[in-house]
Each structure stands twice: as structure tokens, then as C-alpha cells.
Amino acid sequence: WTASFQNLGFQADGVTIEFPWVGDKLVEWDKDSKEVIWTWNTFDHFSMLDYDQFGGTWTEAYLSLQYDWTHVNAVIFDESESAIYISTRHLSRITKIDYPSGEIIWNLGHEMPSGQVQMGNEIGFSFQHSLQKLNNGNILTFDNGNLSPEFRGTEQPISRAIEIEINNNNAALFWSYDLSPDLFSFASGNAQKLENGNVLITTVGGGGRSLEINPQGELVWEGLYNLSLPDGAVYRAHRIPGLYPAAYSVLINNLEGENVNNGVFLPEGSSNISFSIVNEGSYRLPLLLQIADEEGWFGAQTLEVTLEPNSTQYVSFNGNIASANNTSLIQLSVE
């Protein structure tokens, strides 16, 4: 591309910065005041000696006259470590950042002129998407493999899901699954470790599809999206427990009567009213229950409960009934 840029009047000498380089900035806002309380800028921590030389990013720069230098596409925060992990696509790099100091703990990926990458060059991932920190401490990512011929010696670009084990300053490939060449994902895609131990892989290749792969590398499920590029590109897919995280029912126990005469008959003096809360969703469901009534039999009581998926919990409120001959409208609020 040197001649192309020189024909446009640029020096293109490999040293002179002649048009904007676009980096990335992480920003943390206070959720209440909306004030910026922390930032991290790639220009402050990455060397501009490092840039993509093989993946075609300069083609876009030639057309737009600005260079998409870093292209961070995934950020995760590990609260237990107080660390941030980022995936920088155009540097084929994964970085672990100390929070809040902002200091780089390590860079993992393709070796570049600055020498800032300490490990993982032999893994050979490139133009990756998505990050997941696993319970065993490993990192799962989707290696798009745009540069797998250059980095891994493959005959053509191969996409794969890879799990990387990191010990001190050493990184090694712990598990991987290569997609067939026709499922190569030049962009987008992701990998998700499921609760059953399998990995869900999503690619734009082959019309877009998701594949569930077990630890032995066997295909156990496949979903085809039949999408056409570029408008139909699927960016990522995640398996979730269900579509309705807050689906529940409240049943009044010992309800008697019909229509407008429905009610619970309570004896005079100390008594209680009970309800059955049914979690009809696929998520753990925390609820706050509040009861109140016109006569003040139950006062103002609150109760916090957490229901497991597809479970029922019995709750009861104690009260003091002044007269069994009176009626009182009882209201139970659930939120």
C-alpha cells in the first residue's frame, strides 16, 4: 500500500504520522452523578510501533484516510482480581489491566516490534472476538483466524474457539476446536462456555450458525441462521436459561367463596395468612413482599425471599384479628 498512499501525496515512510489513527478509550461513569471517574486510553499504554501488517486494515485506511488502529471489541471486569481484560482485534492481542492503577499486567498474543507482548505468540490467534473468564482461571475467546495462514501455517483462514491457560508469565493452549474452512468468520462471532461444560461457538460463516461442542470435540447441537452478508451478519449468540427472567405467580392459600365473595376467613385473635409464590422462570428470582390491610390487622410487614428456578415457596404473615365479624381488604405487593 506504500505506492497507493504516496500517490495520494503522503510520505508513507513508516515514521511520519500523516492522518489520524483511531484508538480506544475505556470510560467509567458514576451511575448517579454521571461524572467520569476513571479512564484508560490505548494511546497511553500501547506503542504505535505495533500495528497490523497483514490483515487488510490499511485497505480501509486508504479509503477513509484514517487508520482503525486497535479496534477493542470485548471488555470484561473481574471483581475478584480487580482487573480488566480487553480484546484488541487489530493487534491480535488480549490484555489484562490492573484496576484502578491502569497498569498493564500482561499482553497476550502476536509478538510485535515494541516487545510489549510477553506471551502467547505460539498460540497464533488473530482478529479475535469475545472474552470469557472461566471458573478455572482460563480465558475463552473466539479466534477468527484471519491471519491463521501467516500465524499458524494453515492453507486458508480457519476460525476456532480456544481456551487459554495462563500461569504467571506463561500461556498455553488448553483446549481448542477448529471450524471447517467454509465456516470461517472474517468478523464477529463468539465462544461461550456453558454450564454443562460444552462450548457454544457462533460464526458468520456458512450463512451464520451456532454450534455446541462438547469437551471431546464432538458436535452435539447446531443452529443455522441462513443469513446473507453483510446485513445479515450475526454478531454474537448467548445461551440463556429462558426468555422470562421474572415470570411468577402468587396463590392465596385457603381462599374460599366465589366471585366478589372470595376471601380468607380468619379467626379472631392471633392468626396468619399465607401465600404460595411460584417461580415459573428459569432464573433465580429475588422478591420483596409487602403486606398491608385496611383494619391494620397485619400492620406493615415486609419479607424478602429468593426462589430457585421452577420452584414454589410458602410464605406466611402473622396478624391480630380484632373481630371475626369484620372484613378488611388485604393487599400484598410483590416486587
Q: Which positions does each model-derived feature cover?
A:
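Enriched for extracellular/lumenal, surface-exposed ectodomains of secreted and cell-surface proteins
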Residues: 332-335
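Short proline/glycine- and polar residue-rich coil/turn motifs
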Residues: 304-313
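Short, solvent-exposed loop/linker segments at beta-strand-coil boundaries, enriched for Pro/Gly
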Residues: 293-299
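Surface-exposed, proline-enriched loop/turn segments that connect beta strands in immunoglobulin-like
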Residues: 260-261, 300-303
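Histidine-/acidic-rich catalytic cores in large beta-rich domains
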Residues: 1-293, 317-330
